[in-house]
């Protein structure tokens, strides 16, 4: 049986505020699918966990893992993978975890006058790209990552999230 290009994705609702967004899980699954189909990475045998949390939860994660004591919109935690060939009996590999904060995400969507689902799609794609090695530490990395995000989001019918901002030179 051929391997699916789509990683297994578990969505964990860790904060009650997400109950107001009953379509959030579907939005996340569509965003992961679109990203997985458009990247040059083998992710079909992998697993991802996406935790939908609140500002307090993501602030704790941000403080513990990055030393930054404030909430943020999304955090990604790529899993460390063993090297070498995988055997047929190996369990699926863990690609990593993504955490998304409701209040910060809602505020950003409102301030930028974007539909909530569009911003959720963007943050999910952004987090997924971090899991497979993309970053935005340098201008060149940011430009590459933003271009890929924009391409993936276009396939979801989401406008370029960077269109209202000056592009990096």
From Swiss-Prot:
GO-annotated molecular function: metalloendopeptidase activity; RNA endonuclease activity; zinc ion binding
Enzyme Commission number(s) of this protein: 3.1.-.-
Main location: cytoplasm
Cofactor binding note of this UniProt entry: Binds 1 zinc ion.
Pfam families referenced in this protein's UniProt entry, alphabetically: YbeY (PF02130)
Keywords: Cytoplasm, Endonuclease, Hydrolase, Metal-binding, Nuclease, Ribosome biogenesis, rRNA processing, Zinc
Family matches, as InterPro entries: MetalPrtase_cat_dom_sf_prd, YbeY, YbeY_CS
Subcellular location: Cytoplasm
Positions bound to Zn(2+): 126, 130, 136
Cofactor(s) needed: Zn(2+)
PANTHER family xref list: ENDORIBONUCLEASE YBEY, CHLOROPLASTIC
Function: Single strand-specific metallo-endoribonuclease involved in late-stage 70S ribosome quality control and in maturation of the 3' terminus of the 16S rRNA.
Name of the protein in its database record: Endoribonuclease YbeY
Organism: Bradyrhizobium sp. (strain BTAi1 / ATCC BAA-1182)
Lineage: Bacteria, Pseudomonadati, Pseudomonadota, Alphaproteobacteria, Hyphomicrobiales
